[in-house]
Regions:
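Short loop/turn motifs that connect adjacent beta-strands in outer-membrane beta-barrel proteins
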Residues: 1, 40-49, 90-91, 132-133
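Hydrophobic alpha-helical segments and helix pairs
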Residues: 1-27
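Transmembrane beta-strands of outer-membrane beta-barrel proteins
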Residues: 2-8, 50-58, 93-99, 137-141
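Beta-strand elements of well-folded, non-transmembrane domains
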Residues: 9-11, 35, 59, 164
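Short, flexible active-site loops
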Residues: 13-18, 32, 56-69, 76-81
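Hydrophobic, aromatic-enriched interface-forming segments
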Residues: 23-65
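Outer membrane beta-barrel transmembrane domains
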Residues: 63-164
Length: 164
């Protein structure tokens, strides 16, 4: 059990004259309580199994330069991410993944927008050695249940992980 604290700083280009921006102009703060439970086998051994759970709460500063308004505020967003992971062979592991999100309603100039979000996603990941020091991780995730304003769809992600 541990405590997680993150600060997300504004990045990228932001213009209040544009309705969509790749950048951000507000800071957000995230607190979490990561938990990991594992069987007693050594970490790298085939058959090692673990359950990792990460509940987080993200707080957002106000956007004081939004498009078409004077101020946007965003309610905190609660999420829980969980992974059941099993080592299949040296350097190869697979996981079943779940993600739950709730909250994050936006208020524009003090008026609630009604876009509170809630939804579940499920998926799987597979990691395979790429080199002696690097792994490729393939992840698929699908929204399985949501409210009208919740995220929808699926994604496939590939990541190259090189520890140092």
């Amino acid at each position: 059990l541990a405590v997680l604290g993150r600060i997300f700083l504004p990045t990228g280009a932001y213009s209040s004259a544009q309705p969509v921006n790749f950048g951000a102009n507000r800071v957000s703060y995230q607190l979490g309580l990561p938990l990991s439970l594992a069987n007693v086998r050594p970490y790298r051994e085939t058959g090692f199994t673990s359950l990792e759970v990460l509940p987080t709460l993200t707080f957002y500063e106000d956007n004081t330069e939004p498009f078409g308004a004077d101020r946007n505020a965003k309610d905190p967003l609660f999420s829980v991410e969980a992974h059941l992971i099993r080592n299949l062979a040296p350097g190869i592991w697979a996981s079943a993944d779940l993600l739950y999100r709730q909250g994050g309603e936006i208020q524009v100039d003090g008026v609630a927008s009604g876009d509170h979000t809630r939804g579940w996603s499920a998926g799987a990941s597979l990691a395979v050695p790429f080199t002696d020091r690097a792994s490729a991780i393939f992840t698929y995730q699908q929204v399985v249940e949501r409210d009208d304003d919740g995220p929808d769809g699926w994604f496939f992600r590939t990541a190259l992980v090189v520890p140092f």
